[in-house]
């Protein structure tokens, strides 16, 4: 999936994965009780931040990676009818392989 959003510095555009709709026992979870997703797919990355010496610091993630991110990190945006999350690289906790 390609998105026409180009993040700046060390920011990352993530498409959150859908939250679970049912429990393991088959109970349907209403929207009001669902947890905010913390996993998503990286759709775009910025060029990286510039350190104190003027060197560009590359990001640890690449487009297509599945990541786990901080529960309350990032900014939710809606673009072209889709919902995305723009995160700082520091909000990404792990890459899922």
Swiss-Prot record:
Question: Record's SMART domains?
Answer: Cpn10 (SM00883)
Q: Which UniProt keywords apply?
A: Chaperone, Cytoplasm
A Pfam family assignment: Cpn10
- For this UniProt entry, what is the primary localization, expressed as one broad class? cytoplasm
Any one of the GO CC terms:
cytoplasm
A single GO molecular function, which one? unfolded protein binding
- Subcellular compartments: Cytoplasm
> What biological process terms from GO does the record include?
chaperone cofactor-dependent protein refolding
- Subunit and partners: Heptamer of 7 subunits arranged in a ring. Interacts with the chaperonin GroEL.
Function in brief: Together with the chaperonin GroEL, plays an essential role in assisting protein folding. The GroEL-GroES system forms a nano-cage that allows encapsulation of the non-native substrate proteins and provides a physical environment optimized to promote and accelerate protein folding. GroES binds to the apical surface of the GroEL ring, thereby capping the opening of the GroEL channel.
NCBIfam families, per database record: PRK00364.1-2 (NF001527), PRK00364.1-6 (NF001530), PRK00364.2-2 (NF001531), PRK00364.2-4 (NF001533), PRK00364.2-5 (NF001534)
Of which family is this protein a member? Belongs to the GroES chaperonin family.
What protein does this entry describe?
A: Co-chaperonin GroES
What's the source species for this entry?
Answer: Nocardioides sp. (strain ATCC BAA-499 / JS614)
């Amino acid at each position: 999936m390609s998105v026409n959003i180009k993040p700046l510095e060390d920011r990352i555009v993530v498409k959150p994965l859908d939250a679970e709709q049912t429990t393991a026992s088959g109970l349907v979870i209403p929207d009001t009780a669902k947890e905010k997703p913390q996993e998503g797919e990286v759709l775009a990355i910025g060029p990286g931040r510039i350190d104190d010496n003027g060197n560009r610091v590359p990001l640890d993630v690449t487009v297509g990676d599945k990541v786990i991110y901080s529960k309350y990190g990032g900014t939710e945006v809606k673009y072209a009818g889709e919902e995305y999350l723009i995160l700082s690289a520091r909000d990404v906790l792990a890459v899922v392989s």
